Every structure is written in structure tokens, then in C-alpha cells.
Amino acid sequence: MSNVNSRLRRARKTRAKIAELKAIRLSVHRSNCHIYAQIIAETGDKVLASASTLEVEVRKDIKNGGNIAAAALVGKRIAEKAKAAGITTVAFDRSGYKYHGRIKALADAAREHGLSF
């Protein structure tokens, strides 16, 4: 089984567990150049808030979108947008990625700015 298939299998299992809980989830996706975060409704059909390194406000503060500092900034922005939408508690969906590096930085920044999971 390839690394990509293993990651996708882990992501499927995590999403199934979160769906059982009927919880709002913070879903994270990363590429080599950017990182994306979305807060998705319990039913999984609606995005309540989103942030990424492609946003104009984020791009003017960072030089490179594929590093830990950029991930921390996205974590801060998603937490602020979630609070503005009245969301304080989410389930963290790391999409099968290791909880390390950019994923960890995003999660820690979101927690620091008021999001609990």
C-alpha cells in the first residue's frame, strides 16, 4: 500500500468516527506550497468558515505558504473566523497527515486563539 493510499485510509477512518459523533470538524489539507483549513458542519455538507495561505490578508504577512509560520497564521485566522461564527468546539480532522510540523503548528495556534478540540 502506498503512502498516499495509507493516508487516505486513515482520513476515511477519522472522518467516519467524527461523523458518528455528529461534531463540527476542523479539516486540514496541506500541499507543498500551501495549507488550508475548513470548519465543516455536522452533516458534512456546508463549510462554515475557511482559511488558507492563499488569502490576501495571509499572503501579505508571509513570504512562503508552505512553512510552519504560515500554518500558525492560518490556525490563528481559522480560530478567529470560527469565533465570529459562534463556534468554540470542533473535532480535529488532520486528513491522515502526521500530527507533526505544519499540522501541529496550525492546531496549536487554533487552540491558543480560543478554539477547543
From Swiss-Prot:
Origin superkingdom: Bacteria
UniProt GO molecular function: 5S rRNA binding; structural constituent of ribosome
Transmembrane segments: none
A Pfam family that the UniProt record links to this protein: Ribosomal_L18p
Keyword Ribonucleoprotein on entry: yes
GO biological process annotation, one example: translation
Record's keyword terms, sorted: Ribonucleoprotein, Ribosomal protein, RNA-binding, rRNA-binding
Record flagged with keyword Metal-binding: no
GO CC field: cytosolic large ribosomal subunit
CDD domains (UniProt xref): Ribosomal_L18_L5e
Family of the protein in this entry: Belongs to the universal ribosomal protein uL18 family.
Subunit annotation: Part of the 50S ribosomal subunit; part of the 5S rRNA/L5/L18/L25 subcomplex. Contacts the 5S and 23S rRNAs.
Described purpose of this protein according to its UniProt entry: This is one of the proteins that bind and probably mediate the attachment of the 5S RNA into the large ribosomal subunit, where it forms part of the central protuberance.
Full protein name: Large ribosomal subunit protein uL18
Organism of this sequence: Methylobacillus flagellatus (strain ATCC 51484 / DSM 6875 / VKM B-1610 / KT)
GN (gene name): rplR
